[in-house]
Design a protein with these regions (language model features):
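Short, Lys/Arg-enriched N-terminal segments with co-localized hydrophobic residues
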Residues: 1-10
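Large eukaryotic, non-enzymatic subunits of multiprotein complexes that serve as scaffolds/tethers
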Residues: 12-38, 52-60, 79-81, 111-113, ...
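Surface-exposed interaction/gating patches
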Residues: 45-57, 161-205, 209-213, 357, ...
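Short, solvent-exposed coil/turn segments at beta-strand boundaries
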Residues: 46-52, 67-74, 92-96, 113-122, ...
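Short beta-strand segments that buttress and anchor functional surface loops
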Residues: 54-58, 75-78, 98-103, 181-185, ...
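N-terminal glycine/threonine-rich, aromatic-flanked beta-hairpin/loop signature
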Residues: 56-89, 188-222, 368-405, 495-529
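Contiguous, well-ordered beta-strand patches that form the walls/edges
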Residues: 81-113, 208-249, 393-429, 514-558
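Surface-exposed beta-loop interaction hotspot
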Residues: 127-185, 443-492
């Protein structure tokens, strides 16, 4: 197995950009042959089930008759059918015995959690090459990749002669929602997990990946008792690999399994133990009588079951994102480039609770000089919504629409299109009228993946203006001060989302459902700039999603943001507005996991 290698090369391509192989059913059949022997494990397997037999009865699922020959071989009969011999592995965590096995010559297996104190059982059936159909947001359906591990969860019990079946079984839960954990497996793998939604979770691979980026995957949470829960995630739209474990919050320990194919198409099927630490808790905002005991799913219209077997809430945005070349986007921009025009499909729909515009720049002339050979721009502001600018060395002034906010005391935040730019570009400018510092976020259409995605970078400098005496060395700077924090942002009374600042280089957003339960998530790389104490710039492009950029200034003192959206596509290029009122929901203590470290990452 790969974790026994002395050193595994770290993945340095973001998972949402990596081109995973479209493994066929036949290829997967061959790769799964070793699973007939059961999983491997660094820790010693448990013999708690050796020599025993269990009849597991599930609600709305199979009846599983197990005979455990020893601690590595079992015999299974499903629903009274033919007995099958297979390898397995078992681990214990307090009173819970967890065992995992695949069924030879199939792409199917079971992962079973047995509570020896109550005889209650949770069963995860897993399979590959599902041919499963899922709806996507435009109303169409897609067939998921064969390599994506599917799961179906059944709740049940161990049948005991002379005892009545229990009325209450294990169940789904929102009790874990909002919790954050650090885990270190016996394999050496280190992971941060943020359980920010009842249907999804964020995870940061601290050892597998070269970059500290957060990702989102559909997840399930099952409550065994007040301190023991079961968690799973499937890396849908990425490798399709499946991670599952039982955890005890009293001792902050876990026992689990990992099944699937990594980015090198290598089989990973191993069990693990781990130790961890709770790193924080976010508030969850659904009604007090909502206990999260129902699965949140999106149902495919063609699936006859309700909900369909294996159905789950999966956000697959890139599946309906229309690819455009750089030149196609530019031709669309020549036909239509708009600034701050209200349309139903424009980012102004995200500005219902925006901050007011300011006229503090009207009548001012100034020069913004950026470091290290960066641009030098001269400005004349004669109106509240129109400005003139020219690049250093130009003789002709360009006139453009602009919008400006006073985001903090005498701190101006404004934006405009760069005239006739190719690719189309805009600038978002922080101008401090107290100390003379400025930061420019340069945004333009196009990445190396899509012409209709945006890209951006930050440049730092000073302002030359009457009454200002800017410093020579002090600048605004990139920061990690927001890392771990979560805010809800309400753009209109009908539109709210939670933003979680997962790492110094990434950010996720989670959609609130009707009763404020947190549901679907997506994530992307980003940058954070500190402008003042408590005031920050956040820039994110919704990569492998819709390609739109959000560039906002967050004032944590008033819990309000304001800013701009930049996007382009077949309808042209648009510079719009973003603004929301917020609530601080909590924070994870995770900053110390990031940055330059003396230790060498990897396993």
């Amino acid at each position: 197995l790969i974790f026994f290698k002395e050193r595994r090369k770290k993945m340095n391509i973001p998972m949402h950009r990596f081109k995973y192989t479209k493994l066929t059913k036949e290829q997967i059949d061959k790769k799964l042959i070793p699973t007939a022997a059961g999983p491997q494990c660094v820790s010693e397997f448990s013999g708690a089930l050796a020599g025993k037999s269990l009849k597991i009865v599930t609600r709305d699922g199979p009846t599983l008759n197990y005979t455990f020959k020893d601690k590595r071989r079992l015999v299974l009969s499903e629903n009274g059918g033919i007995a099958v011999d297979s390898g397995y592995g078992a681990l214990t965590l307090k009173q819970v015995v967890f065992f995992s096995h695949m069924i030879p010559k199939t792409q199917k297996g079971y992962n079973v959690f047995v509570d020896l104190d109550t005889n209650l059982v949770t069963v995860f059936e897993v399979w590959l090459s599902s041919g499963k159909k899922y709806p996507i947001l435009d109303g169409k359906e897609i067939i998921v990749d064969d390599r994506e591990v599917q799961r179906q969860i059944y709740f049940g019990y161990v049948e005991v002669s002379g005892q009545e079946p229990p009325q209450k079984l294990h169940h789904y839960t929102n009790r874990i929602e909002g919790k954050g954990m650090y885990w270190k497996q016996d394999t050496g793998i280190e992971t941060l997990e943020f359980y920010a939604s009842v249907a999804s979770s964020n995870f940061v691979e601290l050892t597998r990946h070269a970059d500290d980026l957060g990702y989102c995957s559909p997840s399930d949470y099952v409550l065994i008792n007040d301190n023991i829960f079961i968690y799973d995630r499937t890396e849908c739209e990425f490798s399709g690999i499946f991670t599952l474990f039982v955890a005890d919050l009293f001792t902050e320990t876990q026992a689990g399994v990992r099944l699937g194919f990594n980015e090198k198409d290598e089989l990973e099927y191993y069990m693990f133990r781990g130790t961890g630490k709770v790193v924080g808790q976010l508030a969850y905002l659904e009604p007090f009588d909502d206990h999260g005991d129902r699965l949140m799913v999106v149902q495919a219209e063609s699936d006859p079951q309700t909900p369909g077997k294996g159905q789950r809430l999966v956000y697959r945005p890139v599946r309906y994102f229309q690819y455009m070349t750089d030149e196609e986007v530019h031709q669309a921009a020549l036909k239509r480039t708009s600034s701050f025009v209200s349309r139903a499909d424009a980012p102004q729909t995200m500005a219902g609770f925006n901050m007011p515009f300011t006229d503090m720049l009207v009548g001012k002339e100034f020069t913004l000089r950026y470091d290290n050979g960066g641009p030098i721009r001269h400005y004349k502001i004669t109106e509240q919504f129109k400005l003139k600018y020219k690049e250093d060395g130009e003789t002709q002034w360009h006139e453009e629409e602009y919008r400006a906010y006073e985001a903090d005391e005498k701190l101006i935040w404004f934006s405009h299109i760069l005239t006739d730019s190719k690719p189309r570009a805009s600038v978002q400018v922080a101008l401090d009228l107290i100390n003379g510092l400025t930061t420019c976020i340069h945004s333009q259409m196009g990445t190396k993946y899509f012409g209709n995605e945006t890209s951006y970078y930050a440049i730092f400098g000073v302002a030359e203006m009457e009454g200002l005496n800017p410093p020579q060395y002090v600048r605004h700077e990139l920061t990690n001060e927001l890392v771990g924090h979560a805010f809800s942002w309400t753009y209109t009374d009908q539109m709210s989302s939670m933003h979680l600042y997962t790492t110094p280089h990434s950010h996720s957003w989670t959609i609130f459902t009707e009763n404020q339960t947190l549901g679907a998530q997506w994530c992307a790389p980003c940058i954070y700039v500190k402008v003042r104490d408590g005031v920050y710039i956040l820039v994110v492009n919704e990569e492998a999603c819709n390609g739109n950029e959000m560039c906002i200034m967050i004032n944590t003192k008033i819990v309000h943001d304001c800013g701009f959206g930049f996007s382009g596509g077949a309808g042209g290029v648009n510079l719009g507005l973003v603004g929301a009122i917020g609530r601080h929901i909590g924070c994870y203590d995770v900053k110390h996991f990031f940055g330059q470290k003396a230790k060498v990452k990897g396993v």
